Amino acid sequence: MTKYVFVTGGVVSSLGKGIAAASLAAILESRGLKVTLLKLDPYINVDPGTMSPFQHGEVFVTEDGAETDLDLGHYERFISTKMRKANNFTTGQIYESVIRKERRGDYLGKTVQVIPHITNEIQAFIERGAASATCGEPDVAIVEVGGTVGDIESLPFLEAARQMSLRMGRNSACFVHLTLVPWVATAGELKTKPTQHSVQKLREIGISPHVLLCRADRRIPDDERAKISMFSNVPEDAVISVWDADSIYKIPQMLHDQGLDAIICEELKLEPKAADLSMWSDLVEKLEHPRHEVTIGMVGKYVDLTESYKSLIEALRHASMHTSTKVNIEYIDSEEIETHGVESLKHLDAVLVPGGFGRRGTEGKIAAIRYAREAKVPYLGICLGMQLAVIEFARDVVGLKDANSTEFDQETPNRVVALITEWYDREGRVEKRTEESDLGGTMRLGSQRCPIKPGTMAEEIYGKDVNERHRHRYEVNNRFVPQLEAGGLIISARTPSEDLPEMMELPRSMHPWFVGVQFHPEFTSTPRDGHPLFKSFVEAALAHQQSRTAAEVGEKA
């Protein structure tokens, strides 16, 4: 039978519940347990797919095409279990399901209320999510409850967790509460009162936490931990200090050293083998002792909010570990390039244009792509980054000066990138796609396997085929592919059924490393294995740096 660990948060948001939950999962997995994670989001949106990256951060896409919270990305990076749609649900989904049942008459005319109908539905979603785990029936399901204790939106989820714990009985569920212990500079001390009040608020709901994870900018002294223990009624050894670390991959060892996994296993009456965190120690060692260093420019419009590119940043970090190369990411606002030109790119070892949407800043990105192509700087374009690379090539190499995407210019006669529903086939016929089409409307989501063209750089990187996740509405238009190929561009991968371009590259005779991908490879990168595309990209950046350095030395000589 699956046992549950509920992770809640108090005092303030953004303390790192997702990292804490994922780290605990990693430790338990290292002890031989099958583990899955779920994220409960209190907002009323059905999913984060249409939410602004400025408010919500990155939208993480699962293998089965669900648009989910970025914490699911942390889950997949920390454990081997893959996440699915059932691993993340929102208040919006819960109410939608309950209202649908009410309309069908499932409640037999009863008054539908938060208790028991909403809370029962939440429990059903939790159990369904745990049962759908890709690892088989999990020994432990860790459930992260979004929001902060005291928020009105979180109350039904906390009540459902309380009811579920009561229903399942002793040693079947436990609660871990993450709080803030702030350092007050004027007083010169850590303050435990916010944590005391947060636990008090949780106990008012009927939940007594078994473990407290106390976040601070420094290690919490034993006397302060004893004070928190006394006022919160949590054993002192279960008051765990979680201080700021320069890498999230140090957190599993930090929690294990303080006995978190032992406390959880004791509470749930689990007797797994001893933990083996050597993999995490090795990864941290690689991260902290690189042999090389490169600077990669990420050109985008969300550069002030790195949460928007969380998986991408982590994928580059994974490549850093596996190539012994420190990767410095320089965030460059594409609108600044439109105003001031490409001077800010000239010291870079590689250029990356990530996914995005909307017209703002696109001409700056295209200017950056042109610079990378002409200066022979390694370039990686992801999703929109590939589409803009095709547009730049069509304009500046093929000669279609007004080439564009219909996302930015509905009137352009040369629609080299177009919405799926207004897509052209190779004969120039418009292919209409609707909600009933195989692609499911105007968004392509989830994993898709595609064969790779032999003899290409893509084949060197991936092998015979590629299986990556998608999240986009626009596609490279097949009508223009013959002209692009005549100019030298290579379509190195296509979808097997719809014949849609998946990867593009330039031959080495034109450029040493220039690759665009329609999918999002960052979603499948893990610290355990890295990712072949990002490893190749970092290696190309290092090779470019070394060749440039050699040329500069030659000039001085």
Curated annotation (Swiss-Prot):
Ranges where the Glutamine amidotransferase type-1 domain occurs: 295-547
Molecular function GO labels: ATP binding; CTP synthase activity; glutaminase activity; identical protein binding; metal ion binding
EC code(s) of this entry: 6.3.4.2
Signal peptide: none
Annotated metabolic or biological route of this protein: Pyrimidine metabolism; CTP biosynthesis via de novo pathway; CTP from UDP: step 2/2
Gene3D superfamilies from the UniProt entry: 3.40.50.880, P-loop containing nucleotide triphosphate hydrolases
Binding of ATP, residues: S14, L15, G16, K17, G18, I19, D71
The protein's enzyme class: ligase
Residues the entry annotates as binding UTP: S13, K191, T192, K193, P194, T195, Q196, K227
GO CC terms of this entry: cytosol
UniProt activity-regulation remark: Allosterically activated by GTP, when glutamine is the substrate; GTP has no effect on the reaction when ammonia is the substrate. The allosteric effector GTP functions by stabilizing the protein conformation that binds the tetrahedral intermediate(s) formed during glutamine hydrolysis. Inhibited by the product CTP, via allosteric rather than competitive inhibition.
Residues at the active site: C383, H520, E522
Annotated region (Amidoligase domain), positions in chain: 1-270
Keyword terms, alphabetized: ATP-binding, Glutamine amidotransferase, Ligase, Magnesium, Metal-binding, Nucleotide-binding, Pyrimidine biosynthesis
Sequence similarity: Belongs to the CTP synthase family.
Identification of the protein by name: CTP synthase
Protein species of origin: Paraburkholderia xenovorans (strain LB400)
